[in-house]
Amino acid sequence: FKFFITGSSATLLSKELGTKLTGRHVDIVVRPFSFLEFLELKGFEVNKESIYKTETKVEIKKYFEEYLIKGGMPEYLIYNDTELLTRVYEDTIIKDIAVRYKVDNVAILRQLYSYLINNFANRFSYNSIKRVTNIKSVNTIKKFISYLEETYFAKTINKFDYSYKKQIINDKKFYVLDNGFIEVLSKKVAKDHGWLLENLVFNCLNNNHEVFYYSGKKECDFLIVKNKEIKQVIQVCYELNAENREREVEGLTEAMKKFKLKKGLLLTNSQEDEFIIEGKIIKVIPVWKWLLEEKQ
């Protein structure tokens, strides 16, 4: 027999299944739609050859702009009703966490999560959050953020350091695990598509990789770790231009030099290029193409 068990996180979190169920069991994390699945939902067929055709690329780019904003929550994509995402957040996230962990002051829980959602993809420290919220305890902030991660709503990553102690101490970065929630829940009037692009890239990387960010003299968005070694460095920039090109490229090349890598990846919204700097190969690829090539 096969049993598929579902339920509210207020009742049972995935990490507790092993202690509650006897015998063998497999946990399968069902994530929001990938870009390829989004295209399939739209009835748009894509293959490795077609993504290089001009007429196909125009259509794909149009769909990608929608995916970047709306994310991949299936019910929301089908009915286009923002209330569906609001309800998931209020019922599954806020209420379930409050019940499961017996949070008395739901207002400060909500305040913290609102702050993080409005500052996604940015660096933060627990003390900086303490200064801008009404939460007086760093330990409470840590606990509240861990609750959010356990519901698969968000994820924090560390600055890479060979010292685990420094990883814990240094600033974190916060990502929401579906862009649709950002669009619906963020209080910001102007939407920064650059941050949305970075958040989307993180979610793809987070599915299969251990991810850190790099910060030295310059910064690089993502480091991919496999078997305790840095295997890839990735910078995300919505559009390379005269104002940001030096900063973005130098952050990437500094990380490449630091970890002795010959190649680096710079993901953009639509630009594509390849160039060599100081013997280092930098490949510039649109995120939509990178997402589809990863799945082929």
What spans do the regions from the language model cover?
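Short glycine-/polar-rich loops that comprise or flank the Walker A/P-loop
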Residues: 1, 22-26, 260-263
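Short, polar loop motifs at secondary-structure junctions
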Residues: 8-15, 267-273
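Structural recognition of the conserved hydrophobic beta-strand(s) that form the central parallel beta-sheet
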Residues: 2-8, 29
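Interdomain hinge/linker elements that couple catalytic modules in large macromolecular machines
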Residues: 36, 40-216
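A cross-kingdom feature that marks ATP-driven nucleic-acid transaction machinery
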Residues: 146-153, 157-296
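Conserved AAA+ ATPase "SRH/arginine-finger" region at the nucleotide-binding site
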Residues: 26-36
